[in-house]
Curated annotation (Swiss-Prot):
Keyword Magnesium annotated: no
Family per similarity comment: Belongs to the triosephosphate isomerase family.
Record's protein name: Triosephosphate isomerase
Gene (UniProt): tpi1
One GO term of the biological process aspect: glyceraldehyde-3-phosphate biosynthetic process
Organism annotation: Xenopus tropicalis
Residues the entry annotates as binding substrate: N11, K13
GO CC field: cytoplasm
Lineage: Eukaryota, Metazoa, Chordata, Craniata, Vertebrata
Amino acid sequence: MSSRKFFVGGNWKMNGDKKSLTELINTLNSGKISADTEVVCGAPTIYLDFARQKLDAKFAVSAQNCYKVAKGAFTGEISPAMIKDCGATWVILGHSERRHVFGESDELIGQKVAHALSENVGVIGCIGEKLDQREAGITEKVVFEQTKAIADNVKDWSKVVLAYEPVWAIGTGKTATPEQAQEVHKKLREWLKTNVSEDVAKSVRIIYGGSVTGGTCKELGAQPDIDGFLVGGASLKPEFIDIINAKQ
């Protein structure tokens, strides 16, 4: 049995308003949540304060992105200092939508990781291949390069969670089979052992994202190297509670 605490992040993406999020938060607050699982809710920037005020203390709050410096003339951006000021303690960085919709590079993501960690904000660092890359047989090459860009900027791994999200399985209804997901998670752990340290490889949580639902979570969560989930669409529904409790 792994000593790594199960970690479930809900990425609300650009969804919700105060009315619908209040309903969701009330459902989460009244739900029976496993004490053995760390739960983080990724709210839209404009609702970080709102989410932190309304969610019970057993839930942490995460931003979905931040910039690589503390302040300045960067219109539309937010800093880790602002995230903390809202009572949030995590940030999602390198999500495939940031990479592929907004053109963020490995280098920029690495710089963001370094700055967030220097400000003591926890990082959920996302990696994952696109369908054409998987079909070309370069899944490992892609995810190792993305992981290296993150790892090169990490001094203290206790504040980092890695999220493997095969891009072809995000919001598509396609899910990597538990075996496919486990295979990549195992390879990532081996990469960490070789390139960072055995201790980090054993302790860092590697979570899975990509169309995780109440129906798929138990089998995925049973894999030895899958330490939780980063959940998109299903995190806005009551079934998020089932996903949080996947190990029960």
